[in-house]
Structures are given as structure tokens and as C-alpha cells.
């Protein structure tokens, strides 16, 4: 029996997702598979390629032939070079770790709460100087008014 390592298409229209499968060469593209050995999601950035390396190595060793597309994927992951005894390829582009959305939300909420609380709390004022004489601060009632002070209080314009 001729065995192939090929892609089985899954997913939606315009959003393909593939499983890397071991199948008889005479079966349909999306037909029954002998074994599932990985996934390939080309629409992700970077593309997701997950392969069960030990199972692929086994199937290659017993004579399974990869399709052209699968062979390119195996070259990117380094499994093809491992099988052929060639030097390993350069490392793949790795997706950055995603930030936990709940933790990020809570951190933003705490930061916003900290900013909102700051204006509501009055700042501590410096204590007033008690040594300053109070006589200069408030004018005495029996002191004679100057012309400027007297004119400002009356409605006369001059």
C-alpha cells in the first residue's frame, strides 16, 4: 500500500486550516486518514505549524512519501533535514506571548482608580505660621481710612 503524508483541508471558506495526515494515496483529499500527525494554519501571523516529529520520522522511515506542500512544511520545522541527515534549518519566527486579557483589564482598572482617587483627596496644606502678627493681617476698625480706601467704598467717581 502506498502511503502519503499530505494535508487534509478543514476550516471555513477563505480561512483554511489543515491537518497533516498519513493516508493511503488512493483516498480522497478529505477522506479517511490513517493517522493525524500535525496541524497547519496559514492565516495566522506567523503561520502555525505543529508536527508530531517522532511520528513523522517513523512514517518517513517506513516509506511514506510527503506531498510537495507537506515537504516544504517539514523543511521549515526541520523534520525533513533530520530524516535526510542534513544540517538543521534556521529557527522559525515565533509568535509573541499573548497578554492575559483579564490581568491587563484589572491593571488598567487599578491605574484608572488610582488616577481618579488622587484629585478627590485634598493635598495636605503647610501649617500656617503662628508667629506672624495678626494686627497687620486685619485692619483695625478705629484706624482712619486713607483716601483710596474711602473712595473705593463710596459710589463716587472722580
Curated annotation (Swiss-Prot):
Family indicated by similarity:
Belongs to the bacterial ribosomal protein bS16 family.
- What are its GO biological-process terms? translation
Kindly indicate whether the keyword Ribonucleoprotein belongs to this entry. Answer: yes
Q: Give the molecular function GO annotations.
A: structural constituent of ribosome
Q: Where is the composition biased (Basic and acidic residues)?
A: 127-148
Which source organism does the UniProt entry give?
Salinispora arenicola (strain CNS-205)
PANTHER family, per database record: 30S RIBOSOMAL PROTEIN S16, SMALL RIBOSOMAL SUBUNIT PROTEIN BS16M
Q: What is this protein called?
A: Small ribosomal subunit protein bS16
Q: Where is this region: Disordered?
A: 111-158
Q: Where are the transmembrane segments?
A: none
What Gene Ontology terms describe where this protein resides (cellular component)?
cytoplasm; small ribosomal subunit
Sorted alphabetically, the keyword list is: Ribonucleoprotein, Ribosomal protein
Please tell me whether the keyword Ribonucleoprotein is annotated for this protein. yes
| Taxonomic superkingdom | Bacteria
Amino acid at each position: 500500500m502506498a502511503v502519503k503524508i499530505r494535508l487534509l483541508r478543514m476550516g471555513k471558506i477563505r480561512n483554511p486550516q489543515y491537518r497533516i495526515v498519513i493516508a493511503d494515496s488512493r483516498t480522497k483529499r478529505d477522506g479517511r486518514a490513517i493517522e493525524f500527525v500535525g496541524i497547519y494554519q496559514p492565516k495566522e501571523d506567523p503561520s502555525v505549524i505543529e508536527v508530531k516529529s517522532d511520528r513523522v520520522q517513523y512514517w518517513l522511515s517506513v516509506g511514506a512519501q510527503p506531498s510537495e506542500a507537506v515537504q516544504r512544511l517539514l523543511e521549515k520545522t526541520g523534520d525533513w533535514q533530520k530524516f535526510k541527515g542534513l544540517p538543521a534549518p534556521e529557527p522559525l519566527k515565533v509568535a509573541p506571548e499573548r497578554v492575559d486579557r483579564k490581568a491587563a483589564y484589572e491593571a488598567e482598572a487599578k491605574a484608572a482608580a488610582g488616577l481618579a482617587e488622587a484629585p478627590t483627596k485634598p493635598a495636605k496644606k503647610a501649617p500656617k505660621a503662628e508667629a506672624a502678627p495678626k494686627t497687620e493681617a486685619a485692619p483695625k476698625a478705629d484706624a482712619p481710612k486713607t483716601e483710596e480706601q474711602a473712595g473705593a467704598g463710596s459710589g463716587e467717581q472722580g
